[in-house]
Amino acid sequence: MAGEDHQWQGSILYNMLMSAKQRHAAPEAPEARLGDQCWGCSCGDEPGVGREGLLGGRNVALLYRCCFCGKDHPRQGSILYSMLTSAKQTYAAPKAPEARLGPCWGCSCGSDPGVGREGLPGGRPVALLYRCCFCGEDHPRQGSILYSLLTSAKQTHVAPAAPEARPGGAWWDRSYFAQRPGGKEGLPGRRAMALLYRCCFCGEDQPQQGSTLYSMPTSTNQTPAAPEERPGAPWWDTSCGALRPVALKNPQVVCEAASAGLLKTLRFVKYLPCFQVLPLDQQLVLVRNCWAPLLMLELAQDHLQFETVEVSEPSMLQKILTTRRRETGGTEPLPVPTLQPHLAPPAEARKVPSASQVQAIKCFLSKCWSLNISTKEYAYLKGTVLFNPDVPGLQCVKYIQGLQWGTQQILSEHIRMTHRGHHDRFIELNSALFLLRFINANVIAELFFRPIIGTVSMDDMMLEMLCTKL
């Protein structure tokens, strides 16, 4: 039999049977090869090792025939084994990515470190990785762009920390009376909630209390808070709320006193020797431009006091009905007037003075009364106002300029002789003249003369008074 076995050792059947028996036997471990690396698999990287832990301490090496080199290699070094083990790694928990020095331009992974989700059983952190669409690398969810968008959208419903106080910015990025950036108090647990809004000017997030839209009324049912007490605004400031229309409380008495003051003013101007030498057209130019401040000085000298009452302007319907009646020739009845019908012109032709404009007149009168100006000082001040070389349309500018300079010199000499502190007195008188710049001539005409002269122009009345003997 031994010879027969030796005879069949080289046959194909013998080789198949012997290879089948090797599965149940414990073959010896393959010897380590010195070189001869296999290029078709990874057997050259890892040495062939056996499976330990069987009964008797025998090692079993599962060999596979390499499809490239034709040699037997252990299972750990085959290509199929490497593919299967690498595929299983996708289901395992990956390690947290190491911190990179260079920031990723496609997401915010460079800003926030890669952290995992805490709070799972056992306290094990789990990092959910997402493939970045820009850099092609895996980043934790906290560092992705989508996560940043979602978390920023959720901040409007949660209570974020109050923003830090920033240095005062430019005036256009917030309202003037902006409150301090803070949260909404009164929530359960005394938690502060700051509602942030993106500023359309500076592009930064600012609290709602500091924005310009917050200052506007947000609801019709909202009760306005008591305004803070601010320093008193000057009478020429139009933001103080004194734009309501007013009228004289006693128009007949005040208008007669104002007309008498205008008559005395024109008589004083007309009979000045230096004024009489001027041509009539030059006289008319000076009077038309200086009658209002001259009248204010005369009313201050006469100590004219008056009171005003607030009136309501005619409605749009009343203006339409009045205009329609004038066009149709008076066939329709007149609407109910708000002022004296025999003194006031039509509603669309009137410009009712406002409270701030009347307050400017009273301020000038009070200033003059506080200085106790004498009769001569009033006369010199009137001469200074009358001979104004800056009046447009004036031809004899040098002559008028010389008259004004001479009047100032006479006033200064008079003050030096009658007052010790003549420099201060001269400055105070000129400061009173400076207040005349804030008084409009049309306001004086509407307030004191419109109820009497009606639609007659003040320029025509000045011409008539200059040509007639007063």
From Swiss-Prot:
Pfam families in UniProt: Hormone_recep (PF00104), NR_Repeat (PF14046)
SMART domains, alphabetized? HOLI
The stretches annotated as sequence repeats are 1-67, 68-133, 134-200, 201-253
Principal place of residence: nucleus
Q: Which GO terms describe its molecular function?
A: DNA hairpin binding; nuclear receptor binding; protein domain specific binding; protein homodimerization activity; RNA binding; transcription corepressor activity
Q: Which residues are in the NR LBD domain?
A: 205-469
| A GO CC term attached to the entry | ribosome
Matching entries from InterPro entries are given as: NHR-like_dom_sf, NR0B1/2, Nucl_hrmn_rcpt_lig-bd, Nuclear_hrmn_rcpt, Nuclear_receptor_repeat
Where is the motif named LXXLL motif 2 mapped on this chain? 80-84
Per UniProt, the short sequence motif AF-2 motif occupies residue numbers 461-466
Please provide the record's keywords in A-Z order: Cytoplasm, Nucleus, Receptor, Repeat, Repressor, Transcription, Transcription regulation
- Give the residue interval(s) assigned to the motif LXXLL motif 1: 13-17
Could you list the residue ranges that cross the membrane?
A: none
- Chain spans, region 4 X 67 AA tandem repeats: 1-253
Tell where it localizes: Nucleus; Cytoplasm
Q: Which SUPFAM superfamilies does this chain map to?
A: Nuclear receptor ligand-binding domain
Instruction: Give the family per the record.
Output: Belongs to the nuclear hormone receptor family. NR0 subfamily.
Function recorded in the entry: Nuclear receptor that lacks a DNA-binding domain and acts as a corepressor that inhibits the transcriptional activity of other nuclear receptors through heterodimeric interactions. Component of a cascade required for the development of the hypothalamic-pituitary-adrenal-gonadal axis. May also have a role in the development of the embryo and in the maintenance of embryonic stem cell pluripotency.
What does the record note on quaternary structure?
Answer: Homodimer. Interacts with NR5A1, NR5A2, NR0B2 and with COPS2. Interacts with ESRRB; represses ESRRB activity at the GATA6 promoter.
| UniProt note: domains | Homodimerization involved an interaction between amino and carboxy termini involving LXXLL motifs and steroid binding domain (AF-2 motif). Heterodimerizes with NR5A1 and NROB2 through its N-terminal LXXLL motifs.
> What is the protein name given in its UniProt record?
Nuclear receptor subfamily 0 group B member 1
The species this protein belongs to is Callithrix jacchus
Upper taxonomic classification of the species? Eukaryota, Metazoa, Chordata, Craniata, Vertebrata
